[in-house]
């Protein structure tokens, strides 16, 4: 198979699944419904349209499949379908019974631009024997010669941007899209079975997998068909639907007569990236011939203005968090998924995250022979998260939480609100709380190097961060303890940390957790205080509601390093005012490291995911900050302490996303400039 061509589509292929209502053995009626569906799909810019198994006749014709009358009608109406859609720029995959080489076989006709490009033999109808057919070959179909292939054949677009196969392939899968038409009787478990198979197959083979089952109108003599359909991408669901889900959305049964239609934009460039990044993945197989289709078939000659994909502004959260806010629409609608899941689903994910991190800390304590931990707490979400994890780690080892030393280290920018929140949070967990001011030591140090206290610059700020780290490390030495770092993945990606200061620790427990996840963890702790509040009779340890209030206060506090003196005890140094929203930077971080997106594609998917929340100018500004700091601050990530990998993003130079510290970012900056100019 040839390599990827020049991508002018943004890397997306618009795929539609359609299960229009059928009448069993009524080819004329079914053909008209299919023509309507094809024309509607073409008007929406669909590139590939997949129909269910034997959709032109209905899959429940049984012994009638062997009748000359039905087979002749199929051939006639395939020609009618071609004629009725000749001006449509898409590829329709239509499953039909064909009499080939003495057998009635289930074939998929590739219909485009008014003709049948090929027939793909799926299998032989059980009632008619099982004699194997030698392919490839050529047959006369509808009065024209048509090549015939088997399911192990891969078809590629003329531009080489994507490829597909009809039905699951054996062994390695060279195709980027696997298209499966079903005619399977439905049970209550069928949607879950189809979805589980699609998720597993697409994850194993790093491909996109789409399926559609027969639906309304099939014979109900012995079974019913639910039109289950779905598109999965490298293990993740892009969209799912069925007649049952239509009913659950409140659509009247009469709506089912018009059939089910689902469409989405499949990110084939993501599939290509995942395969390149996946060590040992084979995309070529000796038993998988590749056929290049003629040019001009697909509508994907330019990028669509609007993406038909789930809106996922927080990609670090698992698929279980994704729940559609609206009914999955017909071809003319828009697919919109948002982070909104049942609380038990969210809580399970968040609790597992905390417990895995705590396991890492517990194992490191055992390895070092330590029984104490030291954490610097500031009243922000990062240090609160680290403290929460450390408390859990001591529980795992049956060590009293009093062996967890929470040090508040107030300096020139510390406010009473953040210091009070830090101390209250630590006491609720049962920690030993200690306060050590850094003001005198930093003042003396700045005087020694000839730096005035009025000059609140980088030296002024970094001196405080390094003093805090020195105190924490020295206190850990005193206590024979492990000093835990609190910096998160968002700060690591942006280099928003002091080299030799908060950049250093003995174990960086938050290193793979972005700010959005850290905030969610503290909010979760506030929702279930009984899981974390220390069981003690101490009058200083707040219970339940008080702990929840302090968690809420910590989450609501603006992110700040608190290194500049406050105004009337209010924070004046807000990180997100300087860098841009962390939710944007976390979004960029995920997609550049996990999916390999560049600036142009990041801009497009961010605009889609966040809707009207940010203007184009705001997105461009945040992208410029992100890429500038990603490259300029790599030297800090080249020497980081150990820390557990808890998400898909890991910035460790040992096992994660890494590039040399002196790498040029000129290519990415140039693409950003083109983006800013509207090119």
From Swiss-Prot:
Pfam families (UniProt xref): NAD_synthase
The record's section on PROSITE patterns has:
CN_HYDROLASE
Q: Which Gene3D superfamilies match?
A: Carbon-nitrogen hydrolase, Glutamine-dependent NAD+ synthetase, C-terminal domain, HUPs
Matching PANTHER family: NH 3 /GLUTAMINE-DEPENDENT NAD + SYNTHETASE, NH(3)-DEPENDENT NAD(+) SYNTHETASE
Q: Which residues bind ATP?
A: 376-383, 486
Q: What is its EC number?
A: 6.3.5.1
Query: What keywords sit in the KW lines?
Result: ATP-binding, Ligase, NAD, Nucleotide-binding
Name of the protein in its database record: Putative glutamine-dependent NAD(+) synthetase
InterPro entries from the xrefs?
C-N_Hydrolase, C-N_Hydrolase_sf, Gln-dep_NAD_synthase, NAD+_synth_C, NAD/GMP_synthase, NAD_synthase, Rossmann-like_a/b/a_fold
Species, as recorded: Treponema pallidum (strain Nichols)
Taxonomic classification, please? Bacteria, Pseudomonadati, Spirochaetota, Spirochaetia, Spirochaetales
Pathway recorded for this protein: Cofactor biosynthesis; NAD(+) biosynthesis; NAD(+) from deamido-NAD(+) (L-Gln route): step 1/1
Its recorded reaction(s) are:
deamido-NAD(+) + L-glutamine + ATP + H2O = L-glutamate + AMP + diphosphate + NAD(+) + H(+)
Give the Gene Ontology MF terms in alphabetical order.
ATP binding; glutaminase activity; NAD+ synthase (glutamine-hydrolyzing) activity
């Amino acid at each position: 198979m040839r390599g990827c061509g020049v991508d002018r589509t943004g890397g997306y292929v618009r795929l539609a699944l359609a299960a229009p209502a059928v009448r069993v053995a009524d080819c004329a009626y079914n053909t008209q419904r299919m023509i309507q569906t094809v024309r509607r799909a073409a008007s929406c810019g669909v590139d590939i349209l997949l129909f269910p198994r034997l959709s032109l006749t209905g899959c429940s014709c049984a012994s009638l499949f062997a009748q000359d009358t039905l087979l002749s009608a199929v051939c006639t109406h395939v020609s009618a379908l071609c004629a009725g859609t000749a001006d449509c720029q898409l590829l329709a995959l239509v499953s039909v019974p064909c009499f080939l080489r003495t057998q009635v076989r289930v074939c998929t006709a590739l219909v485009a631009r008014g003709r049948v490009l090929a027939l793909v033999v799926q299998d032989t109808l059980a009632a008619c024997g099982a004699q194997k057919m030698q392919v490839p070959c050529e047959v006369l179909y509808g009065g024209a010669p048509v090549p015939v292939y088997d399911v192990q054949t891969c078809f590629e677009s003329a531009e080489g941007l994507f490829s597909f196969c009809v039905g699951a392939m054996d062994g390695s899968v060279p195709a980027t899209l696997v298209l499966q038409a079903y005619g399977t009787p439905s049970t209550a478990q069928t949607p879950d079975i189809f979805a589980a198979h699609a998720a597993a197959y697409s994850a194993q083979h790093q491909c996109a997998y789409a399926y559609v089952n027969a639906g309304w109108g099939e014979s109900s003599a012995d079974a019913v068909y639910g039109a289950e359909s779905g598109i999965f991408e490298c293990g993740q669901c892009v969209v799912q639907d069925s007649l049952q889900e239509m009913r659950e959305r409140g659509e009247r049964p009469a709506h089912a007569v018009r059939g089910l239609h689902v469409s989405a934009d499949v990110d084939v460039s993501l599939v290509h990236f995942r395969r390149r990044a996946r060590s040992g993945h084979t995309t070529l197989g000796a038993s998988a011939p590749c056929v290049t289709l003629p040019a001009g078939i697909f509508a994907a000659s330019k990028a669509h203005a609007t993406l038909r994909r789930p809106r996922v502004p927080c990609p670090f959260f698992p698929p279980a968090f994704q729940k559609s806010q609206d009914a999955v629409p017909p071809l003319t609608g828009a697919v919109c998924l948002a982070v909104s899941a049942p609380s038990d689903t969210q809580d399970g994910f968040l609790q597992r995250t905390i417990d895995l991190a705590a396991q890492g800390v517990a194992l490191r304590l055992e390895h070092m022979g330590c029984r104490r931990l030291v954490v610097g707490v500031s009243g922000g979400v990062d240090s609160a998260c680290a403290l929460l994890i450390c408390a859990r780690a001591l529980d795992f080892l049956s060590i009293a939480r009093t062996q967890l030393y929470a040090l508040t280290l107030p300096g020139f920018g510390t406010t009473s609100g953040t210091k009070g929140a830090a101390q209250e949070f630590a006491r609720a967990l049962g920690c030993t709380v200690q306060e050590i001011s850094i003001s005198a030591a930093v003042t003396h140090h700045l005087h020694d190097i000839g730096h005035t206290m009025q000059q609140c610059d980088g030296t002024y700020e970094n001196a405080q961060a390094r003093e805090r780290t020195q105190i924490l490390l020295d206190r850990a030495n005193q206590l024979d303890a492990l000093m835990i770092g609190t910096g998160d993945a968002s700060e690591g990606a942006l280099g928003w940390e002091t080299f030799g200061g908060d950049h250093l620790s003995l174990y960086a427990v938050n290193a793979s957790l972005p700010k959005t996840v850290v905030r969610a963890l503290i909010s979760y702790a506030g929702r279930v205080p009984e899981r974390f509040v220390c069981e003690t009779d101490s009058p200083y340890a707040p219970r339940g509601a008080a702990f929840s209030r302090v968690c809420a206060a910590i989450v609501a506090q603006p992110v700040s390093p608190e290194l500049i003196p406050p105004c009337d005890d209010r924070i004046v140094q807000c990180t997100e005012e300087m860098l841009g929203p962390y939710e944007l930077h976390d979004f960029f971080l995920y997609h550049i490291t996990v999916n390999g997106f560049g600036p142009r594609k990041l801009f497009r998917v961010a605009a889609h995911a966040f809707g009207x929340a940010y203007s184009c100018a705001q997105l461009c500004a945040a992208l410029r900050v992100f890429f500038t700091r990603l490259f300029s601050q790599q030297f800090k990530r080249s020497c980081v302490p150990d820390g557990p990998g808890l998400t898909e993003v890991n910035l460790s130079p040992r096992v994660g996303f890494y590039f040399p510290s002196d790498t040029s970012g000129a290519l990415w900056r140039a693409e950003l400039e083109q983006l800013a100019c509207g090119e």
